Amino acid sequence: MNLPTSAIRIPLCLALLAGIAAFAVSSASAATVVALGASNTYGKGVARNQAFPAQLEAILRAKGLNVRVVNAGINGDTTESMLQRMDRVVPNGTSAVVLQPGGNDGRKGRPDRTAEIQSRLSARGIAVIMLPNNAFRGLPHQADGMHLTPEGYHMIAESLASQVAAAIGR
């Protein structure tokens, strides 16, 4: 039996469109979390998938949450620089920001702009989860004594998971 090619093409096109629509809905409903910070956010000394933002996303997804965690950490960053780039790296629609100011302000003699970052994010309706420097005490560090090992970053991600899940309302 020879079917007209339209009998095959139309269902195939409809199936393709349904798949695209399902992907778009799935992607659109994913909550966005931005990890904004310095080298311990970036994951200095470890692979990108071992930094805490990537591990946090994996933990949340394993719990069934549709979430995307963006790593906006920069080695050596100051809170002044974070404030300057914040609107660019924290897009509208972001559900939460994990803010890790780091210790570079003090080392570089720069003003601490953490409160201003928090205020501006809150004014945009974005939940702010602070990750203070003392959160890294007692965790496994690399030989430099400042940056965590993959295990240490995993411990940070685990400690943040419930706060992030609550902040994004999932």
Task: Label each PLM-derived region with a short phrase.
Residues 2-15:
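Bacterial N-terminal signal peptides that target proteins for export
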Residues 19-24:
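Hydrophobic alpha-helical membrane-insertion segments, chiefly the h-region
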Residues 54-66, 74-170:
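Alpha-helical cap/lid subdomain in secreted, periplasmic
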Residues 29, 65-68:
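Residue-level signal for beta-strand positions within conserved beta-sheet cores that form or flank
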Residues 31-46:
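Short glycine-rich His-centered loop
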Residues 50-51:
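Short Gly/aromatic-enriched secondary-structure transition segments
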